Structures are given as C-alpha cells and as structure tokens.
C-alpha cells in the first residue's frame, strides 16, 4: 500500500509545531507516545499537569517512525514506545538518559469485527477471500505480533494477500470501524474504549500464540519534568489506569 505524500508531510509539520511550542515554554515536556497508548496517556498527562507545574505536549505515532525522528534529532524529552526493542536500539546509540528505561505495560491483541453475534475466530480462520486489517508488521510492534498470531494459527500464507496494513494500530482499527474491512486485529486497549461492546464481536486469543508485547518508556533528557513523569508512572493512579485500558502490568505473567 503506497502512503500518500500528505501522510508524510503533515505529521512532520505537526511535529515541527509541537517542537516550536515546547521550546517556547520552559515548563513544557514534549512526549513521543505510541499510537496505541495515546488515549490513556492523555488522561495521565491531565492528572500529571494537575499535580505539577509542567505541561505535557504529546506527539502520537508509530514507534518505528518516532524512533527515526529521535535518531534524526527530534527534541523529545520522553519516549513511550509500543515495545522494548526500540528502546534498546536507542540505548545502543547512547541517545536516552543512561539507565532510565522502564517497562510500563504489556499489550494484548484482540480479533475484532463491528458485526454483532458472529464467531470472530471462525470468520478469521475461514478460507474465503476477506480483507483483514492489521498494523504494519514492519512499523508497529502490534503489527509484528499480529503477523505472528496469524502464522501460529496457520493462516498467514493463505491470507497474506488479503492483509490491509495500517501505519499503526489506530489506523488498523479505523479500517474496521469505517466498514472498509470486515475483520481485523486491534489492541485490547482499543476494545476497552468501544461503547456497547455487546453490539460487536471479538475474540481475545491466548497470549501463547504471540510473543509478549512488552511496552517500555525512556527519558531522553535529564531534567526535572522528565524525572517526575517517570516517577508518576509508578503511582497507583497510573497503574490502575493502565489496567482499566486493557493492558497488563509489567509483572503480569
């Protein structure tokens, strides 16, 4: 799937505006956050701002694209990724604050259809031609896990030509939500945001069918607001919120 030029230019302009805003405010914290965690992070930011004198400015996108932006000098203060491997790659480049990374959540996959009262697993396993939306396995940790799930279900080879890849897990969900695709793989955190879940159909596959989606964060600047945000992630408020949005905690088996 070709990505229109506007999809490349527009996020770059947004990042430039966010960066300019953050640089103009000494009390601002520019945070790169994976698209799957954007909604809970907005709530975390609101509470953090109430408890401190610092303003959080969020930039949401795929983890791989944000990695590229950081390597190319984007002045983020804090990076909340959708995996652990990307953080480790940054650490090898000695870009983050030393020994500042931590795992904050464990993601889960859900096979989802907007249709009501259907066997989603059976629909996924069906041999007939059907479009299946997933996040891009090359860009998104959730996409990588989705591909692994389909492989372990022994249907990747038969269905790979029917895959519709979103840039990230949020776009994959939008493909399903708008009716362009009948079924897809989304994050459990997205399912938790859907009102009237009983009007839709979903299947939560066993986590032994794909590698754990361990999600980590890291400080990119050694300053007070970054350290305060790191500490805030370990509070009961944030830990409870993470679970409410369908994530597991780092010590969950």
Task: Cite the ranges covered by each PLM segment.
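Exported/periplasmic ABC-transporter solute-binding proteins
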Residues: 26-51, 64, 68-74, 81-84, ...
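Short beta-strand
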Residues: 59, 101-102
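A short beta-strand-loop structural module common to alpha/beta enzyme folds
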Residues: 55-64
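Bacterial N-terminal signal peptides that target proteins for export
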Residues: 2-12
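Bacterial N-terminal signal peptides
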Residues: 11-20
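Short, P/G- and charge-enriched loop/turn segments at secondary-structure junctions
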Residues: 96-100
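Sec/Tat signal peptide C-region and signal peptidase I cleavage site
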Residues: 20-26
């Amino acid at each position: 799937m070709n990505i229109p030029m506007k999809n490349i230019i527009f996020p770059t302009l947004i990042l430039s505006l966010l960066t300019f805003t953050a640089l103009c405010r000494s009390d601002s914290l520019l945070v790169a956050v994976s698209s799957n965690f954007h909604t809970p992070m907005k709530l975390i930011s609101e509470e953090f701002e109430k408890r401190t004198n610092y303003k959080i400015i969020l930039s949401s996108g795929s983890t791989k694209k944000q990695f590229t932006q950081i390597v190319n000098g984007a002045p983020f203060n804090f990076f909340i990724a959708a995996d652990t491997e990307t953080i480790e790659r940054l650490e090898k480049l000695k870009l983050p604050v030393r020994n500042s990374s931590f795992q904050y959540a464990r993601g889960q996959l859900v096979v989802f259809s907007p249709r009501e009262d259907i066997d989603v697993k059976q629909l996924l396993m069906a041999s007939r031609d059907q479009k299946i939306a997933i996040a891009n396995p090359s860009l998104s940790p959730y996409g990588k896990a989705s591909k692994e799930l389909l492989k372990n279900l022994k249907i990747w080879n038969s269905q790979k030509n029917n895959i519709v890849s979103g840039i990230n897990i949020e776009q994959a969900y939008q493909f399903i939500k708008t009716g362009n695709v009948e079924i897809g793989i989304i994050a459990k955190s997205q399912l938790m945001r859907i009102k009237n879940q009983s009007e839709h159909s979903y299947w939560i596959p066993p986590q032994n069918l794909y590698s754990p989606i361990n999600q980590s964060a890291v400080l990119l600047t050694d300053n007070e607001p970054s350290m305060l945000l790191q500490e805030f992630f370990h509070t009961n408020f944030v830990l409870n919120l993470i679970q409410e949005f369908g994530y597991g905690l780092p010590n969950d088996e």
